[in-house]
C-alpha cells in the first residue's frame, strides 16, 4: 500500500506538472497577442476665438513628432482674405523656429501663388488670382500612413501627393488668417498614442490564470523532486534546510564590505544615466506608459521597462539621490552576502576548502568592491543584473547538487527577469547555459518516473512567464515598433565590433576608461584566464570543487560572449560582472596560493602580472562622471606622487619582478626544484598579492571621494547633497540650493563715481581709450569645437575616433543687436539691456596696442548675497585656473580703489579674473569680493591688448555686483523644466516637463551640464533628428541664458540655465484642447510605422 500511495502521488504530481505547465505556457504565450485598451487623443480645430471673433492658433507639440493622421480643410474664400503681399495660410510649426520648414507643413501665400509644402517638399501650388476668382472651393490637406498630399479642389492640376515619410511634424496649428470659424474650415489631428495602453479584462484574466498555472506547475515539479528521492515532505524540508556556519573571517569581511557599500552610497559618484532613468520614472505616471524621454520619439521602454516602473514608485516617495539609489546599494549588499554565504561554500566546502580560507574570503570582498564601486552606484540596472546573475548561478548549482529541478525552474524565472532589465541583462542566461548539461542529465535519469513532458513543460512554462512582465500593458506590435525605432535611430554597434567595448577602456583622459574601471575589468579578465590556465594545467586543486569552478568560469566566459549581442557597447555594462569578479578573485587567490608555494618562479610571475595590471589601470585618470569629479584628486590626469606618474612606478616594479621571475626560471636548470617552504608566512605571501592590489585600489577610490567630501566642504559635492538630504528628511534640493542665479543682471550694474571725467564713449571707455571702441566686438563668437573621446555614454558620435562638436549657451555666440547706449551693435548676452549697458572692444584694431582704463565704479556694501564683481566679456582674455595653470589671452584686470576723506581715489591692487570660458564667446568673468582689500569701495577695469593678431582681442561691459539667489528660489518646484541627462539627478526638486496623451508640456527653463558635456552628449543625444526633446523646443521656443554660479566654487563650470520663451505667445496660441477616447486594439495591430527619419 505505501508503494501504491507513492505511485499515486507521483502520478498526481506529474499530471499537475504537465497540465499546469502546458496551460501556463499557452496562457503566457498568448499574452503579447491579446487585445488592450488604447487611449486615443484627437485635436479638432478651430478652438475658440479672439476678442474680435477671429479663429485662434493652438499649441500642441507632439512627442512622436508626426501624428498618426492629419486632415485639414480650408475654404478658398478664407485664403483669399490674406493681404496682397501674402502671409501664412496655415502651418503645423511656427515660422520662426529652427529649421521648421524642413519638418512641418507650411501653406504660404505670396503675391502670386499659394504653395503647400510638407517638409520643404512642394505638394500643390495654386495661383492666387484663380483662388480670388472663385476657381476653387477649398484646400484639402491630408497626411497618414498612405502618404501626404494636398488638393486645391476645383483647380485643374491643383493636387499632388508625397510619400509617407513626408508626414509633417505637428507642434500646433498656426495661421495669419483673420477669419471667424465657418463651415469648411477644420482640422483634425489624430495623435499617435499606440503606447498608451492598459490591459483589458480578458488580458488581465489570462495573465492571472497564466501566473497561477505556472506556480501550480512549479509546485508539481517540486513534489516530483521530493517523491523522486523517496522522502516525506517533513524529511525533505529537514534535509535541505540550509546550514550556514559563519566564521570570524566571513563576519569581518561582511562588516568591511557592507560598511564600504554604505559609505559609498553617501559619498560615491553616481552613474551617467541617473538623470535619464530618474526623469523617465518621474514622467511615466502622467505619460501613461514608460516613455523614453530623451530620444526615440517617445517610444516605450518595453521590454526593458519593469525596473523603471519600480523606480517610478520610489520617485513617488522622494526624488533625492540617496533614496533613489537604495536598490543599487541593497543589491550590492545582497550580492556580497550571497557570495560569502553560498557561492564560496559551493566552490570549496569543508575544512581546508575555499570557504574556510580567510585570505580567499577577504580577497573576494576586496575584488568585489573594486568591481562594484566604479560601476554600480547609480540607477542603472547593472547592480540588479549582477545580483540576478549570482542568484541564477546559485539556483542552478542547488539544482545540480540536490538533484532537484524546481530550483532550475526558479533560476529560469530569475534569469529572464534579469534579462529584461536591460539588453546587457542577457548575461543572466549564462548560468543556465553552463548548467544545462547537468540539468539535462538529471531529467534523463528521472525519465522513468517523471517522464520528459512534465519537467520540460514546467521549465518551458517558467520561461514563458516573462511575457506577463514584458507585455503586461504593451503588445507585441508596440514592443516591435519600439525596437525598430531604436535600431533605426541608433546608436547601435554590430556584435563583431564588441572589441570597441574594451577599446573604450583604454582611451586616455576618458571617464569611461578611468583608472578604477580599467582595474575592475583587467582583474576580471586576469582572474578568469588565470584560473582557467591553472585548472587546465593541474586538472584539480585541493579544496576547490571542480564542477562548480568550471561552471563559474563558463558562466563568466559565456556572459562576456553574450555581451557581444547588446546593441550598445558602453564600458559601464561591465558592472554586471561585479559579483562574478568577486568570486573569481577568491578562486584566484586560493588556486594561485597553491602554485605559488610550488614554485618561486610561479609566485613571482603572479606578482608581476598583478603589478602590470596596476600599471595599466593607473595609466588612466581618476575620473568620475560630472559632479563626481568635484574635488577628486587627479580627476583629469594620471595619478602622480612627487611629480612621478604612479603608472611608471608600477611598470618599473613589474619589469623588475619579471626579471626576477626569469632568473628563477633559468636557475631551475642549475639549482633544481625551487619549491617554497609550506609555512604560515609563505602561505600568506603566496595568497595575498591579489588581496593587497585590490585593497590598494578600493582604498584609493574611497579615499578620493572622502577627500573631496571633507576638504571641499561646504562647497557642493555629491556627499554634501546626500548628507543634507538625510539630515532634512529628504527635503533638500541638492544642486538647486547651491547654484546661484542673477534674476536681473541689469539691477546689479555698478554706477560710476560722480564727478569723474571721461570721453565720448562714456565711463566704460574712460578718458582716452586707444583701440577700444563700442563697435570693437566680433560678430561670430562661436567657441572652439569640443573634442570628446570615443566611448562617451549617451553620445551618438563616432565610436572609434575623437569627435568634435560646437555648442554655446544661448545668446553668447555673437551677432547683431539693437543700438546700445554707447553706439554698439553687439548682441548682448544674459539678459543685459543694451539701453543701459555700454560695450567696449578691441576687435579690428590690428595696428597698435589697444588700451583702456574705465572710470571708477562704486562698490556696494558687502553682503552674503552679493559675493562677486562680474564683468561680461568676450574674446581672448588672460586668466588663471584654480590649480595655477594659465589660459592665454590679453589682459583684462579689475583694480580696486579706496576713496579718501577728500574724495580722491587711491588705487589699490589689480587682479586677473576667474574665467571658466569658453573663448571667445560671451561669458561672465568673476572677481570675488573676498579678494578685495577690506577698505576697497570702488573698482575699475584696466584693459590692455598689445597683440595684433586678429584672434587676440576682447570686449567687455561694465562691472556689476548682482544680487544672487538660489536656483531653487528662482525656478521653484512647479515650473516645467527640461533637465539634461547629466543634470536631472542633481536637481531633484525641479519638475521635468510632463507628457500626456502624446503631447509634451512646453518647458520654461533648461538646465544644462558643463560646456564639454553639453557639446559631447546632451546636444547630440537629445537632438530633434533622433526624436529627443529638441524636436519641439527648437521648433516652438527661443532661448536666453541666465547668468549662474556655483556657490563658493567660482572656478567651476557647473553648467548653465537657459530660459525658454514661446515663439508664439500663449495668449495667441493657447494649449490645445484634446478629445480623449478609448479603443480596443489586438496585440498584433500596428497603425503604420512611426516616422523616425531626420
Curated annotation (Swiss-Prot):
The GO annotation for biological process reads:
Actinobacterium-type cell wall biogenesis; cell wall organization; response to antibiotic
Compartment(s): Cell membrane
| Species for this entry | Mycobacterium tuberculosis (strain ATCC 25618 / H37Rv)
Q: Which family does it belong to?
A: Belongs to the emb family.
Q: What is the effect of changing residue 462 to V?
A: Resistance to EMB
**Annotated gene:** embA
State which Enzyme Commission number(s) the record gives. 2.4.2.-
What's one GO-annotated cellular component?
Answer: plasma membrane
GO terms assigned for molecular function: arabinosyltransferase activity
Q: Which residues cross the membrane?
A: 12-34, 205-224, 247-269, 322-344, 356-375, 408-430, 451-470, 519-536, 543-565, 575-597, 604-626, 641-663, 684-706
What are the protein's UniProt keywords? Antibiotic resistance, Cell membrane, Cell wall biogenesis/degradation, Glycosyltransferase, Membrane, Transferase, Transmembrane, Transmembrane helix
Instruction: Tell me what the record says results from residue 321 to S.
Output: Resistance to EMB
Summarizing the annotation, the consequence of altering residue 350 to D is: Resistance to EMB
Q: What does the record give as the function of this protein?
A: Arabinosyl transferase responsible for the polymerization of arabinose into the arabinan of arabinogalactan.
Name the domain of life this protein comes from: Bacteria
What more does the entry say? Answer: This is one of the target of the anti-tuberculosis drug ethambutol [(S,S')-2,2'-(ethylenediimino)di-1-butanol; EMB]. EMB is a first-line drug used to treat tuberculosis. EMB inhibits the transfer of arabinogalactan into the cell wall.
* Pfam family name, one: Arabino_trans_C
Q: How does it sit in the membrane?
A: Multi-pass membrane protein
Induction info reads: Positively regulated by the transcriptional regulatory protein EmbR.
Q: Kindly provide the name given to this protein in its UniProt entry.
A: Probable arabinosyltransferase A
Amino acid at each position: 500500500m505505501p508503494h501504491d500511495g507513492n505511485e499515486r502521488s507521483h502520478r498526481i504530481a506529474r499530471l499537475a506538472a504537465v497540465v499546469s505547465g502546458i496551460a501556463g505556457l499557452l496562457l503566457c504565450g498568448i499574452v503579447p497577442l491579446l487585445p488592450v485598451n488604447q487611449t486615443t487623443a484627437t485635436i479638432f480645430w478651430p478652438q475658440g476665438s479672439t476678442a474680435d471673433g477671429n479663429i485662434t492658433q493652438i499649441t500642441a507639440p507632439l512627442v512622436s513628432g508626426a501624428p498618426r493622421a492629419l486632415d485639414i480643410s480650408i475654404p478658398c474664400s478664407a485664403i483669399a482674405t490674406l493681404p496682397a503681399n501674402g502671409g501664412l495660410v496655415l502651418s503645423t510649426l511656427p515660422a520662426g523656429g529652427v529649421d521648421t520648414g524642413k519638418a512641418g507643413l507650411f501653406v504660404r501665400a505670396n503675391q502670386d501663388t499659394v504653395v503647400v509644402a510638407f517638409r520643404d517638399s512642394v505638394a500643390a501650388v495654386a495661383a492666387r488670382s484663380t483662388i480670388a476668382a472663385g476657381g476653387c472651393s477649398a484646400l484639402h490637406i491630408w497626411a497618414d500612413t498612405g502618404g501626404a498630399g494636398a488638393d486645391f479642389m476645383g483647380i485643374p492640376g491643383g493636387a499632388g501627393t508625397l510619400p509617407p515619410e513626408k508626414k509633417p511634424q505637428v507642434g500646433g496649428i498656426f495661421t495669419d488668417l483673420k477669419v471667424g470659424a465657418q463651415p469648411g474650415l477644420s482640422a483634425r489631428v489624430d495623435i499617435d498614442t499606440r503606447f498608451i495602453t492598459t490591459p483589458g479584462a480578458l488580458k488581465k484574466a489570462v495573465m492571472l490564470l497564466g501566473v497561477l498555472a505556472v506556480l501550480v506547475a512549479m509546485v508539481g515539479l517540486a513534489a516530483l523532486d521530493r517523491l523522486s528521492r523517496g522522502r516525506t515532505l517533513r524529511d525533505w524540508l529537514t534535509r535541505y534546510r540550509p546550514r550556514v556556519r559563519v566564521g570570524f573571517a566571513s563576519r569581518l569581511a561582511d562588516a568591511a564590505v557592507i560598511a564600504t557599500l554604505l559609505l559609498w552610497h553617501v559619498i560615491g559618484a553616481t552613474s551617467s544615466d541617473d538623470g535619464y532613468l530618474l526623469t523617465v520614472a518621474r514622467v511615466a505616471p502622467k505619460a501613461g506608459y514608460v516613455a523614453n524621454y530623451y530620444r526615440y520619439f517617445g517610444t516605450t521602454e518595453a521590454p526593458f521597462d519593469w525596473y523603471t516602473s519600480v523606480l517610478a514608485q520610489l520617485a513617488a516617495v522622494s526624488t533625492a539621490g540617496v533614496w533613489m539609489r537604495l536598490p543599487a546599494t541593497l543589491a550590492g549588499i545582497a550580492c556580497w552576502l550571497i557570495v560569502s554565504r553560498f557561492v564560496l561554500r559551493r566552490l570549496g566546502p569543508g575544512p581546508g576548502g575555499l570557504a574556510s580560507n580567510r585570505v580567499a574570503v577577504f580577497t573576494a570582498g576586496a575584488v568585489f568592491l573594486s568591481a562594484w564601486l566604479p560601476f554600480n552606484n547609480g540607477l542603472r540596472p547593472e547592480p540588479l543584473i549582477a545580483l540576478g546573475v549570482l542568484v541564477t548561478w546559485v539556483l542552478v548549482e542547488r539544482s545540480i547538487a540536490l538533484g532537484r529541478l524546481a530550483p532550475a525552474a526558479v533560476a529560469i524565472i530569475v534569469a529572464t527577469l534579469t534579462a529584461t532589465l536591460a539588453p546587457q541583462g542577457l548575461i543572466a542566461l549564462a548560468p543556465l547555459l553552463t548548467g544545462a548539461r547537468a540539468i539535462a542529465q538529471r531529467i534523463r535519469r528521472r525519465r522513468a518516473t517523471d517522464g520528459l513532458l512534465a519537467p520540460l513543460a514546467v521549465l518551458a512554462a517558467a520561461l514563458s512567464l516573462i511575457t506577463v512582465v514584458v507585455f503586461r500593458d504593451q503588445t507585441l506590435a508596440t514592443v516591435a515598433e519600439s525596437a525598430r525605432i531604436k535600431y533605426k535611430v541608433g546608436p547601435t554597434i554590430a556584435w563583431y565590433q564588441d572589441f570597441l567595448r574594451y577599446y573604450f577602456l583604454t582611451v586616455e583622459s576618458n571617464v569611461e576608461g578611468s583608472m578604477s574601471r580599467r582595474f575592475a575589468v583587467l582583474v576580471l579578465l586576469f582572474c578568469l584566464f588565470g584560473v582557467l590556465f591553472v585548472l587546465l594545467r593541474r586538472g584539480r586543486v585541493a579544496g576547490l570543487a571542480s564542477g562548480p569552478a568550471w561552471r563559474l568560469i563558463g558562466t563568466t566566459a559565456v556572459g562576456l560572449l553574450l555581451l557581444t549581442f547588446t546593441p550598445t557597447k558602453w564600458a559601464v555594462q561591465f558592472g554586471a560582472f561585479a559579483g562574478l569578479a568577486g568570486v573569481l578573485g577568491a578562486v584566484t587567490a586560493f588556486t594561485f596560493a597553491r602554485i605559488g608555494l610550488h614554485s618561486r618562479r610561479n609566485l613571482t610571475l603572479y606578482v608581476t602580472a598583478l603589478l602590470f595590471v596596476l600599471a595599466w589601470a593607473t595609466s588612466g585618470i581618476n575620473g568620475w562622471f560630472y559632479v563626481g569629479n568635484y574635488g577628486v584628486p587627479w580627476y583629469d590626469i594620471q595619478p602622480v606622487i612627487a611629480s612621478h606618474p604612479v603608472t611608471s612606478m608600477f611598470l618599473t616594479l613589474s619589469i623588475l619582478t619579471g626579471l626576477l621571475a626569469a632568473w628563477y626560471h633559468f636557475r631551475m636548470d642549475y639549482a633544481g626544484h625551487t619549491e617554497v617552504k609550506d609555512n604560515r608566512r609563505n602561505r600568506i605571501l603566496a595568497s595575498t598579492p591579489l588581496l593587497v592590489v585590490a585593497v590598494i585600489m578600493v582604498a584609493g577610490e574611497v579615499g578620493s571621494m572622502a577627500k573631496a567630501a571633507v576638504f571641499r566642504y561646504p562647497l557642493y559635492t555629491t556627499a554634501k547633497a546626500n548628507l543634507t538630504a538625510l539630515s532634512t528628511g529628504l527635503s533638500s534640493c541638492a544642486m538647486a540650493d547651491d547654484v546661484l542665479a542673477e534674476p536681473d543682471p541689469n539691477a546689479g550694474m555698478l554706477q560710476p563715481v560722480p564727478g569723474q571725467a571721461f570721453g565720448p564713449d562714456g565711463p566704460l571707455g574712460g578718458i582716452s581709450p586707444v583701440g577700444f571702441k563700442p563697435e570693437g566686438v566680433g560678430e561670430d563668437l562661436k567657441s572652439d569645437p569640443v573634442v570628446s573621446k570615443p566611448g562617451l555614454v549617451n553620445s551618438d558620435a563616432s565610436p572609434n575616433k575623437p569627435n568634435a562638436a560646437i555648442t554655446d549657451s544661448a545668446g553668447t555666440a555673437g551677432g547683431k543687436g539693437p543700438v546700445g547706449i554707447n553706439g554698439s551693435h553687439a548682441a548682448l548676452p544674459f539678459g543685459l539691456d543694451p539701453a543701459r549697458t555700454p560695450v567696449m572692444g578691441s576687435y579690428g584694431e590690428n595696428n597698435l596696442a589697444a588700451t583702456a582704463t574705465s572710470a571708477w565704479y562704486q562698490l556696494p556694501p558687502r553682503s552674503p548675497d552679493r559675493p562677486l564683481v562680474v564683468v561680461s566679456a568676450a574674446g581672448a582674455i588672460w586668466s588663471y585656473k584654480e590649480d595655477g595653470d594659465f589660459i592665454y589671452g590679453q589682459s583684462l584686470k579689475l583694480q580696486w580703489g579706496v576713496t579718501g576723506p577728500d574724495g580722491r581715489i587711491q588705487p589699490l591692487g589689480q587682479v586677473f579674473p576667474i574665467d571658466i570660458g569658453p573663448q571667445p564667446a560671451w561669458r561672465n568673468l568673476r572677481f570675488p569680493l573676498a579678494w578685495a582689500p577690506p577698505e576697497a569701495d570702488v573698482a575699475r577695469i584696466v584693459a590692455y591688448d598689445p597683440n595684433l593678431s586678429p584672434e587676440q582681442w576682447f570686449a567687455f561691459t561694465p562691472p556689476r555686483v548682482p544680487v544672487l539667489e538660489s536656483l531653487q528660489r528662482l525656478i521653484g518646484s512647479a515650473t516645467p523644466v527640461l533637465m539634461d541627462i547629466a543634470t536631472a539627478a542633481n536637481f531633484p526638486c525641479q519638475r521635468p516637463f510632463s507628457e500626456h496623451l502624446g503631447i509634451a508640456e512646453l518647458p520654461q527653463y533648461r538646465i544644462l551640464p558643463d560646456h564639454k558635456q553639453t557639446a559631447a552628449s546632451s546636444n547630440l543625444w537629445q537632438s530633434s533628428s533622433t526624436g529627443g526633446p529638441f524636436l519641439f523646443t527648437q521648433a516652438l521656443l527661443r532661448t536666453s541664458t541666465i547668468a549662474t554660479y556655483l556657490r563658493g566654487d567660482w572656478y567651476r563650470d557647473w553648467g548653465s540655465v537657459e530660459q525658454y520663451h514661446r515663439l508664439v505667445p500663449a495668449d495667441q496660441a493657447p494649449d490645445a484642447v484634446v478629445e480623449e477616447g478609448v479603443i480596443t486594439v489586438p496585440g498584433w495591430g500596428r497603425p503604420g510605422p512611426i516616422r523616425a527619419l531626420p
